[in-house]
Amino acid sequence: MFLRAWGIARSLVMYHGVPGRHRRMLRLYGEFLRPGDVAFDIGAHVGSRVRAWRRLGAHVVAVEPQPDCLRVLRLFFGRDPGVAIVPLAAG
């Protein structure tokens, strides 16, 4: 249990806590996504791309099979009508 919690905490810091990372993602994905577009995040993990894509105005389908990551996604985006969280694996 401790190692799983540590892994999620590490991912949150790595993907949401690095200064400038979100800004760089907005710059990159802003070249491709426009408000109202639909984007699929297959393997959404802890939602760093979901966050960036929503900021750009895209509707997001976040596919994630891992229960711990699903909890994070639901916590961050569960009430956002522009995000559909799909608790499945794709392959």
Question: What residues fall within each predicted segment?
Answer:
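Phosphate/nucleotide-binding beta-alpha loop and adjacent structural elements of enzyme active sites
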Residues: 1-91
